[in-house]
From Swiss-Prot:
Keywords: Amidation, Cleavage on pair of basic residues, Disulfide bond, Secreted, Signal, Toxin. It is found in: Secreted. Disulfide bonds join C54-C68, C55-C66, C60-C69. Transmembrane segments: none annotated. This is Conotoxin reg3f. Belongs to the conotoxin M superfamily. It comes from Conus regius. GO terms for molecular function: ion channel inhibitor activity; toxin activity.
C-alpha cells in the first residue's frame, strides 16, 4: 500500500512539479511611490488649497485635507 502511494506521489511530482506553482517572491512588489507618480497634481485635491475644505472640529484633527483647523 505504501509503495503504491510513493509511486503515485512520484508520478504527480513529475507531471506537476512544485516549481510550476507561483510563489510570492515571483510577484512584483507593490510600489506606492510609483502609483503616486501616475496621479498628477491637477487631479489630486490634496495639492489644491482652494479645493480643500474646512472640516468640523472632530474631523479636522484626523484629516490632512483640512486647512482651516
Amino acid at each position: 500500500m505504501m509503495s503504491k502511494l510513493g509511486v503515485l506521489l512520484t508520478i504527480c511530482l513529475l507531471l506537476f512539479p512544485l516549481s510550476a506553482l507561483p510563489l510570492d517572491g515571483d510577484q512584483p512588489a507593490d510600489q506606492p511611490a510609483e502609483r503616486m507618480q501616475d496621479i498628477s497634481p491637477e487631479q489630486n485635491p490634496l495639492f489644491h488649497p482652494d479645493k480643500r475644505g474646512c472640516c468640523p472640529f472632530p474631523a479636522c484633527t484626523t484629516h490632512i485635507i483640512c486647512r482651516c483647523c
